């Protein structure tokens, strides 16, 4: 798929003549980008995929961690997880782990990687070129593996974790290689996880041998000076961390200090959430019970409770008024009964004090009151009479005393 680039021309009448197609030729191998750039520098302008790195060039990466290649070496014929990851990274893009704790920093094939250039930034399809390069890499890796088998068996290292594999012939070695390649590819991380975020963090100290991939500064394809700038920027693409009991304490302290200044990326977790979508079916018969969402149901329940309380208050207000009236009436009746009883008892007591009606138990209250009035008046008249009689008796006494005194004086 050719890309066309137009340069600004001073003669505006020939702007459309300045548009020249940009082609990629298939004679070159993995470094065909540099060759295409050198060839097209005289004929046509650079493609947008070549100078786009200059626009998105990031800051230099921090200093790298010390190499742990010696810790990852194993003496068994069955390669470890780190060896499998190294194999896959060498197979799928040259030196994708340039300047990391696994590979040597002098390999610059990551700058010329076909997969990164094509999948991430180029605008054309390079399937045939990719198949060609991958097949060549596969053949070279098979040859190097067959030659390096005895040398790998003589390397010192810890005993193998599993049982030793059976003696491998050509078919068995190919099957073992495919098994190793599948196991290593299963442990890899996709390119969508590799390239969006910068790499500046380390894996957790308790994790096993795992690959944490990320891009700190993208490569630029523009000549030797730009490649030297990339070397100064120290591109760190892959960092492998192996859990060692002796290094767990130091890594935990450094991790605690780095967590404050660097974000922690966790795998994306997709949770299912239920969205309440209620659509009325006009063709369905009307139902007495209507389903509502949880929030509406709570609001309706609360509204119903409030309505019930208000209705209960409205209904209970006459009931409470009637009950209050009944209570008042009952209280009034009780008090009236007590008053009548007291009045009757008082009439009975008054009747007992009047001699004329004292023995008449059926005497009416009016008769009792009349006889009581007459009796009181008679008692008052008797009182006045007795008082006058007492006064007469006192005077008589005085006269008698005076007469007695005169008699005593005459005898003396």
From Swiss-Prot:
Keywords: DNA-binding, Host nucleus, Oncogene. InterPro entries: bHLH_dom (IPR011598), HLH_DNA-bd_sf (IPR036638), Myc-LZ (IPR003327), Myc_transcription_factors (IPR050433), Tscrpt_reg_Myc (IPR002418), Tscrpt_reg_Myc_N (IPR012682). It is found in: Host nucleus. GO terms for cellular component: host cell nucleus. Residues 156-169 have a biased composition (Pro residues). SMART domains: HLH. The keyword DNA-binding applies. GO terms for molecular function: DNA binding; DNA-binding transcription factor activity; protein dimerization activity. Residues 225-236 have a biased composition (Acidic residues). Residues 241-255 have a biased composition (Low complexity). Residues 327-379 form the bHLH domain. Residues 144-173, 208-263, 309-328 are annotated as: Disordered. It comes from the Viruses. Residues 309-320 have a biased composition (Polar residues). Pfam families: HLH (PF00010), Myc-LZ (PF02344), Myc_N (PF01056). This protein is synthesized as a Gag-vMyc chimeric protein. The sequence shown here corresponds to the Myc homolog fragment of the chimera. The MH2E21 virus appears to be a recombinant between ring-necked pheasant virus and a deletion mutant of MH2 that was constructed in vitro. The MH2E21 virus lacks Gag, Pol and Env genes, and thus needs a helper virus to reproduce. Efficient DNA binding requires dimerization with another bHLH protein. This is Viral myc transforming protein. It comes from Avian retrovirus MH2E21.
